[in-house]
A protein has these predicted regions:
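Alpha-helical segment proximal to the catalytic Tyr-Lys
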Residues: 23, 65-66
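C-terminal helical subdomain
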Residues: 74-75, 82, 93-145
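Rossmann-fold scaffold of SDR-type NAD(P)-dependent oxidoreductases
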Residues: 10, 33, 73
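Conserved mid-core segment of classical short-chain dehydrogenase/reductases
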Residues: 1-4, 23, 45
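Catalytic Tyr-X3-Lys loop
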Residues: 1-15, 56
Length: 145
């Protein structure tokens, strides 16, 4: 049930929105979907989340071929200080044994390596023009721009 919920939120909800935008009478020049590094490199404990983001990445690759007038990017914002990160960094809730890569997040918490959601949003907005320079349907990471 948890796997289905993760897929519904991270993949299918995006598909519903994309289909509505792309099949309506709206000209959409650019679509940016928020992805994650775990969608391209797997790690113990991240199964459903990784698979849901991988599916989202591939959906954008497919749509880039099907809708050539729209530019698609799967964008990983990097570590962002959100409620999800707070939950994952809580040692009483999430074990490093279950999620070995979680220590990297815990080390980044409250540092410049994990900006606030507002700071991350500003960085994404500033990156929008540069995203048009990479091939449509590509995955990219904010930290590599």
């Amino acid at each position: 049930e948890q796997f289905t919920q993760v897929m519904n939120i991270n993949t299918w909800a995006n598909k519903v929105i994309l289909d509505w935008l792309l099949t309506g009478n709206i000209q959409v020049k650019q679509i940016i979907a928020i992805s994650t590094g775990t969608g391209v490199s797997t790690s113990k404990g991240w199964g459903a989340y990784s698979l849901s983001k991988l599916a989202l990445n591939k959906l954008l690759t497919l749509y880039a071929d099907e809708f050539p007038d729209t530019h698609f990017t799967a964008l990983a914002p990097g570590l962002v200080d959100t409620a999800m990160q707070a939950y994952l960094c809580d040692e009483n809730r999430v074990s490093v044994d279950d999620f070995p890569s979680i220590q990297k997040m815990r080390d980044a918490k409250e540092t410049n390596n994990m900006p606030s959601a507002q700071d991350a949003a500003h960085a994404i907005i500033n990156a929008v023009p540069r995203l048009m320079e990479i091939p449509s349907g590509s995955y990219t990471d904010m930290r590599n721009l």
